[in-house]
Amino acid sequence: MAAAADSFSGGPAGVRLPRSPPLKVLAEQLRRDAEGGPGAWRLSRAAAGRGPLDLAAVWMQGRVVMADRGEARLRDPSGDFSVRGLERVPRGRPCLVPGKYVMVMGVVQACSPEPCLQAVKMTDLSDNPIHESMWELEVEDLHRNIP
């Protein structure tokens, strides 16, 4: 039963679900500060005089810019990022409309030239504009307070 809790079904391209909660990040943080590679990404915090954070999974929010064939390009306050595997994500399809504001939880696949996530969860947040207006401050506050 534990194996079922550790992987997201979807055939050979299944995603291994992390055991820790997702870390809220902006696209620019991944572009600028991520080190490592798939399955072993870390967010450098050397500029703040702190140790790195493991990026087992991330939580990002942004506006859908484009969506096609289970992939989407989103834009947060710091830039664009891509999400793939949306055809296997519950509630992914209703969210895939340009202009919608969504949250996506996923596993980092790449950080350069732009972040790319393998989606695990996606939810439409468009009904409440406070989600978008507070997102950047929420991420900033979280990173300021993580030891």
UniProtKB/Swiss-Prot annotation:
One annotated Gene Ontology cellular component of this protein: nuclear speck
GO biological process annotation, one example: DNA repair
Protein modification: Phosphorylated during mitosis.
One Pfam family named in its UniProt record: RMI2
Cellular localisation: Nucleus
Region called Disordered, residue ranges: 1-20
Effect of W135A: Abolishes interaction with RMI1, TOP3A and BLM
Lineage top rank: taxon: Eukaryota
Keywords of the record: Acetylation, DNA replication, DNA-binding, Nucleus, Phosphoprotein
Modified residues (N-acetylalanine): A2
DNA-binding residue intervals: 44-114
Phosphoserine modifications at: S7
InterPro entries referenced in this protein's UniProt entry, alphabetically: NA-bd_OB-fold (IPR012340), RMI2 (IPR032245)
Effect noted on mutating K24A: Abolishes interaction with RMI1, TOP3A and BLM
Illness association: A homozygous deletion of RMI2 has been found in a family with a Bloom-like syndrome and is probable responsible for the phenotype. Patients manifest depigmented skin lesions, multiple cafe-au-lait macules, and growth deficiency. Cells from affected individuals show a high rate of sister chromatid exchange and increased chromosomal breaks.
Functional summary from the UniProt entry: Essential component of the RMI complex, a complex that plays an important role in the processing of homologous recombination intermediates. It is required to regulate sister chromatid segregation and to limit DNA crossover. Essential for the stability, localization, and function of BLM, TOP3A, and complexes containing BLM. In the RMI complex, it is required to target BLM to chromatin and stress-induced nuclear foci and mitotic phosphorylation of BLM.
Subunit: Component of the RMI complex, containing at least TOP3A, RMI1 and RMI2. The RMI complex interacts with BLM.
Recorded family membership: Belongs to the RMI2 family.
PANTHER family according to UniProt: RECQ-MEDIATED GENOME INSTABILITY PROTEIN 2, RECQ-MEDIATED GENOME INSTABILITY PROTEIN 2 RMI2
Official protein name in the record: RecQ-mediated genome instability protein 2
Protein source organism: Homo sapiens (Human)
Gene that specifies this protein: RMI2
